[in-house]
Amino acid sequence: MTDQKQMNTVDSMLPIPQLFAFGLQHVLAMYAGAVAVPIIVAQAMNLPMEDLIRLITADLFTCGIATLIQTLGFGKIGGRIPMIQGVTFASVGPMAMIGAQHGMTAIYGAIIIAGLFTFLIAPFFSRLIRLFPPVVTGTIITIIGINLMPVAINWMGGGIGNPQFGSFTNIGLGFLTFLIVIFVYKFAKGFFSNLSVLIGLIAGTAIAFAMGVTNFDEVGRSHWIAFIEPFYFGLPTFDWASVLSMIIVMLVVMVETTGDSFAIGEIVDKPIGRQELASIIRADGVSTIIGGILNSFPYTAFAQNVGLIAVTGVKSRFVVAASGVILILLGLFPKLAAIVASIPNAVLGGAGIAMFGMIVASGIRSLGKVSFEGNHNLMLVAISIGVAMIPIAAPNFYANFPAWAQIILKSGITFGSIMAILLNLLLNGVNRGDEIKEMGRR
């Protein structure tokens, strides 16, 4: 049985078997989202299957490198917190447009320059931390959870585009997985209780296999080893309009990363100050540069995994570092990736309901420490969450806006976060009370 105190700090080192068991749990939770962007880009560019496979393996490999950079850190790069890294969905639209006009090499040229921009601007962006008092961070954490819930719900239905979406089989599998997670979380002890999501995913997949809903045929068709070749599509080219659009994407990423950082800090009881935030954003920049070199994409924190930390209570950054090692192996050995890919969406959705709901609960807990008397905080929270839900309630609401504006507006997390910051400035001013001074000194 695992000693709970052994896992209740960010710097706790667990036995190797436990590290990789908990690390695998994180990988299974994020895998579907991790491979979605390369699939979408390949489809938009009409790339052959061989190139799609290269994009997926390069993405997984670079996800692992990016996660190791963020969790282990070196020098002033990396936050040294349990933050798993994945490709940002904010980059999909701009990359598709750049690729259609200028080809893959222009995509990677823009990514490399945008990554360098992110690295250089990190210490300046981190000075904005005084704009994130507890009412803003609590609101942003809540918004992150709310905006992730549709992901889990669509997974539970079978995945968008699935002709069997919403079938009794898919929904039943999702709820069964959800119930298994709850049962293990409630009645198992120690180590196994903390593995409730992993056990739910494995049990749900086994049930799906017995029902004929999933199979492992793709494992046999996959190659044993993949080679990650830098600049596979050619040396990068630089179109400055494309570079500018990717820089806008990275500004959005910095806002989202800030929110995710505060969410993780809240859950693992580690204050995120100016220096920590700068290190986290620098890591995003370095990982994005590496992504451009290795035929991958811009990197940021994967909010899906924040909820998993809250569910399991395992706060060790070395667990997520183990996830990084597993992701590297998945990128190098496609047969392993094919096994993970066989987990049905419905099963992922059942686990996702619990994970993403925990992010919402963490945000509410954070807001519970905020005073709503004699100030405008209630209006700030109400409007920020309201505008963040627009893309959820009406996905085409901003369809007639310019492409650059849609990058911001169609992300409920980004627009809701920006709204919370602006409303705090408008309604409360730049509060220089004790809370903000304490954050600014870090």
What are these regions (language model features)?
Residues 1-22, 216-231, 266-270, 280, ...:
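Intrinsically disordered, low-complexity non-transmembrane regions of multi-pass membrane transporters
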Residues 54, 76-89, 130-139, 192-198, ...:
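Short, non-helical or kinked segments that cap or interrupt transmembrane helices
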Residues 23-40, 84-91:
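The first (N-terminal) embedded transmembrane alpha-helix
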